[in-house]
Amino acid sequence: MPYLANLRYAPEPCRQYLHDIYNSVVLNDVVRRNKIRDVDLLARIVAYVIGNIGTTFASTSIAKFLKSEHRTVAPETVLNYIKYCAEAYLFYQVNREDLQGKQILATNEKYYMADHGLREAVFGGNMKDINLILENIVYMELLRR
């Protein structure tokens, strides 16, 4: 985020700037482009993916959890929302290379943030899950090369 250099590293303006960028990407790019009606569901799914960056997860487990919270959502909807975010360059999808046989059919992709500063916008401080953040930074560096 180049503009952050102009803010002289004051914490609150930086957080506000990151939050505004996050809202712009999610609300303008994803919601409007894909005509999403349940913005709260999208925000929850995006927060889940951001919180579990670099790990595999199943869309069916997300759908089952949301069902236990009295929100009916199909696993395909979860996958579509994540795909829409990837198309808006919020996430990068990485397919696993170690799968064989029928495991290839399962959705076992990992997702990485295009800018881990957006994680700061959603969760605040980054020190709790530093291992996930470092893995994300390494992936982005390898992608850049």
Question: Where do the protein language model's features map onto the residues?
Answer:
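Accessory nucleic acid-recognition modules appended to NTPase machines
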Residues: 2-145
